[in-house]
A protein has these predicted regions:
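Charged, gly/pro-rich active-site loop segments
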Residues: 1-9, 83-142
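Anion-coordinating catalytic cores for phosphoryl-, nucleotidyl-, and glycosidic chemistry
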Residues: 10, 19, 62-65, 75-77
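Short beta-strand segments
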Residues: 25-59, 75-76
Length: 142
């Protein structure tokens, strides 16, 4: 993967700042190489555990088909966007991550990531979280 340097160095975050932005976000846009090489982007909830970003979806679908063909992805998170009308601009707090996607097959890791994802979406009681995991985990891909 060839990484181009940012044009606006004054707006580039450190790796630690980028991780902090990822940690406070709840959704982003996953971009994959779709049919015929066309880009396909879809908004998704996510969670971060360690150095990994986990996304969840159904067991089958277009994005999983695309990832099976070409695992190169881009994930973009925007946590703030402030329009500055006087300067005809917008100030963003965002992170763009390039990487390779893979389906999580280890059940323990899958359940931990799904539990973490539930936690990022708000205050959920342990009982509701357990009910959700029992009911939906088997139909969820991470």
């Amino acid at each position: 993967m060839t990484e181009r340097p940012m044009r606006r160095k004054d707006r580039q975050f450190s790796a630690a700042d980028a991780r902090a932005i990822l940690a406070k976000g709840t959704h982003g846009v996953l971009s994959v190489v779709g049919d015929g090489g066309w880009p396909y982007a879809v908004p998704m909830n996510y969670t971060v555990m360690g150095t990994q970003i986990y996304l969840h979806c159904a067991r089958a679908g277009y994005k999983l088909d695309a990832i099976a063909r070409d695992d190169r992805v881009c994930f973009t998170v925007v946590t703030q966007a402030q329009v500055i009308p006087a300067h005809i601009t917008t100030l963003y707090e965002s992170v763009v991550v390039l990487g390779r996607a893979q389906v999580v097959t280890a059940e323990e890791e899958r359940l931990a990531a799904l539990g973490s994802l539930i936690d990022t979406l708000g205050d959920v009681t342990p009982e509701i979280k357990a009910q959700y995991l029992a009911k939906k985990a088997k139909n969820t891909t991470l």
